[in-house]
Curated annotation (Swiss-Prot):
The keyword Protease does not apply. Residues 605-624 are annotated as: Disordered. CDD domains: ASKHA_NBD_HSP70_DnaK-like (cd10234). The gene is dnaK. Belongs to the heat shock protein 70 family. This is Chaperone protein DnaK. HAMAP family: DnaK. It holds the Pfam family HSP70. InterPro entries: ATPase_NBD, Chaperone_DnaK, Heat_shock_70_CS, HSP70_C_sf, HSP70_peptide-bd_sf, Hsp_70_fam.
């Protein structure tokens, strides 16, 4: 059985870890970094992921995707998506099923399809380290992700060629990373997770007793559209507004300028965590009829804090709700853990400290803790980690729409998973032969204000007066927090088939097609790599041949020289194309045409060898003619 890897699929950065010698180890990617930017770029002939994608973003803004996790499992008309539509340099579109998709070079792509590229890089990083194929993974998601978002994340894993053994909540994973080595005792831990695109708070009880550890999530809350990207956007908008005041030009209409502005804003935000002021300096940011324009704006830490103050305050309300749901007060919390890169901001740390009345722990790496926890959970599933029990919860209530468009809850939020619940329903009209059960997720009483997960149609009900047929619907939430539904007609005892017509998400056929596309792209990537290798070898051959021609000088007959030059030109032409066989053929012909060069080089080498031999003989002869002379030492006092 191969290793199960742990992946933190983040909004801004992603990370992969694996158990190595019983300890979770965060792996370095091909660029030598322990975290990988969650950025994907599409060019004419390849897909670029991570730091290389980030570096080329300024020159390719409309085909470079970042923060794609904010779109996963979401509808195009969602308010959160509409906010991003207006600020992202790339195109967000409405799919046929109403989902939010993206478009690059005329290709429409689902967020799970794009996210799969990041997962493929994480998979490759692990395979390079382990020296074997990896097919199984534990992937983390924000605790407040709904059913659609969790299912979409599993779809991304499948498209990347991974069997997702478990979906685990990010704060829970961080608590695992923190608590796995802790000794005896019972601790209440608050995990404050403010990442690139999402915010979660989880209250977790860690019970360590005689080597056994139980991690029980007591309550969770959050906001799946609040994170570092929103902090960046506040700064981006401020800079764009200031520039418009000074120059009268709106940078928001220029994707290239916006991409440069985004990079500069992110850099300035990070700098202001360790310094009180910085300067954003972007020469030639745009131009008009009067010439090029430059952006130079000074920003203080206080200014940044004033821009994002309401965002920080927005994180405090979920803290209050989570504590209330757990039936705890602030004083009951023993430790506070900060997770996510945005928690490095001093103002965020100050807000958390003031709320809990204690300093957060500094011994947890906010960028790596989640991946470490995922690797530990992978170890639990594979049997490599013993005596650890993880009890997670469903973040949102699940129920159905009943008469009067009211949501009736079957499973309350913060219920430990896996769990099941059933309820008996009946017909609303006489002789009704079918019922439609509308499944919802959320906390609102009004059905339409909650997330629609789908409609379950039950046909073939025997004619009877209203209220008489008894149809038992069962909700079953698995350990991934994903809902499964079945229904039984209690009169016949037969289980009826229910088709879940999801209001959004990818169908099984779409996922299967994307898996096939990914496999096809893997072959394309391999061919592209082989093509680049052939080009590089051909370029090296031409360079070496030119050098040999120069060294041969007049010793190379003009007829041979012309043949070699023609062969080199043929190689140059071939390397400009995309035919590997043509490049290899032209390279072979150049090698054959250069046969005379090899003869000249060998003759020259032999001549040099002969000259060295003669020189050696002469030196020996000269040595034989040397006469030993008598000498007398002259003392200073004889002078």
């Amino acid at each position: 059985m191969g290793k199960i890897i742990g992946i933190d699929l983040g909004t801004t950065n992603s990370c992969v870890a694996v158990l190595d010698g019983g300890k979770a180890r965060v792996l370095e990617n091909a660029e030598g970094d322990r975290t990988t930017p969650s950025i994907i770029a599409y060019t004419d002939d390849e897909t670029i992921v991570g730091s290389p994608a980030k570096r080329q973003a300024v020159t390719n803004p409309t085909n470079t995707f970042f923060a794609i996790k904010r779109l996963i499992g979401r509808r195009f008309k969602d308010d959160e998506v509409q906010r991003d539509v207006n600020i992202m340099p790339f195109k967000i579109i409405q799919a046929d099923n109403g989902d939010a998709w993206v478009e690059s070079r005329g290709n429409k792509m689902a967020p799970p399809q794009v996210s799969a590229e990041i997962l493929k890089k994480m998979k490759k990083t692990a395979e390079d380290f382990l020296g074997e194929e990896v097919t199984e993974a534990v992937i983390t998601v924000p605790a407040y992700f709904n059913d659609s978002q969790r299912q979409a994340t599993k779809d991304a894993g499948r498209i990347a060629g991974l069997d997702v053994k478990r979906i685990i909540n990010e704060p829970t994973a961080a608590a695992l990373a923190y608590g796995i080595d802790k000794k005896q005792g019972d601790n209440i831990v608050a995990v404050y997770d403010l990442g690139g695109g999402t915010f979660d708070i989880s209250i977790i009880e860690i019970d360590s007793n005689d080597g056994d550890q139980t991690f029980e999530v007591l309550a969770t809350n959050g906001d799946t559209h609040l994170g570092g990207e929103d902090f960046d956007n506040r700064l981006i908008n401020y800079l764009a507004d200031e520039f418009k005041k000074e120059q009268g030009l709106d940078l928001r209409k220029d994707p290239l300028a916006m991409q440069r502005l985004k990079e500069a804003a992110e850099k300035a935000k990070i700098e202001l965590s360790s310094t009180n002021h910085t300067e954003v300096n972007l020469p030639y940011i745009t131009a008009d009829a009067t010439g090029p324009k430059h952006l130079v704006i000074k920003i203080t830490r206080a200014k940044l804090e004033s821009l994002v103050e309401d965002l920080i305050l927005r994180t405090l309300e979920p803290l209050k709700v989570a504590l209330a749901d757990a039936d705890l007060s602030v004083s009951d919390v023993n430790e506070v853990i900060l997770v996510g890169g945005q928690t490095r901001m001093p103002k965020v740390q100050e807000a958390v400290t003031n709320f809990f009345g204690k300093e957060p722990r500094k011994d947890v790496n906010p960028d790596e803790a989640v991946a470490v926890g995922a690797a530990i959970q992978a170890g639990v599933l594979s049997g490599d980690v013993k005596d650890v029990l993880l009890l997670d919860v469903t973040p949102l209530s699940l129920g159905i729409e009943t008469m009067g468009s009211v949501m009736t809850k079957l499973i309350e939020k913060n219920t430990t998973i896996p769990t099941k619940a059933q309820q008996v329903f009946s017909t609303a009209d006489d002789n009704q032969s079918a019922v439609t059960i509308h499944v919802l997720q959320g906390e609102r009483k009004q059905a339409s204000a909650n997330k629609s997960l789908g409609q379950f149609n039950l046909d073939g009900i025997e004619p009877a007066p209203r209220g008489q047929p008894q149809i038992e619907v069962m909700f079953d939430i698995d350990a991934d927090g994903i809902l499964h539904v079945s229904a039984t007609d209690k009169k016949t005892g037969k289980k009826q088939n229910i088709t879940i017509k999801a209001s959004s998400g990818l169908s099984e056929e779409e996922v299967a097609q994307m898996v096939r596309d990914a496999e096809a792209h893997a072959d394309e990537d391999k061919k592209f790599e082989e093509l680049v290798q052939a080009r590089n070898q051909a370029d090296g051959l031409v360079h070496a041949t030119k050098k040999q021609v120069e060294e041969a000088g007049d010793a190379l007959p003009s007829e041979d020289k012309e043949k070699i030059q023609a062969a080199m030109a043929a190689v140059d032409t071939a390397t400009k194309g995309n035919d590997k066989e043509a490049i290899e053929k032209a390279s072979q012909e150049l090698i054959e045409a250069s046969a005379k060069l090899m003869e000249i080089a060998q003759a020259k080498s032999q001549a040099q060898g002969g000259a060295e031999t003669n020189a050696g003989k002469q030196a020996n002869a000269a040595a034989d003619d040397v006469v030993d002379a008598e000498f007398e030492e002259v003392k200073d006092d004889k002078k």
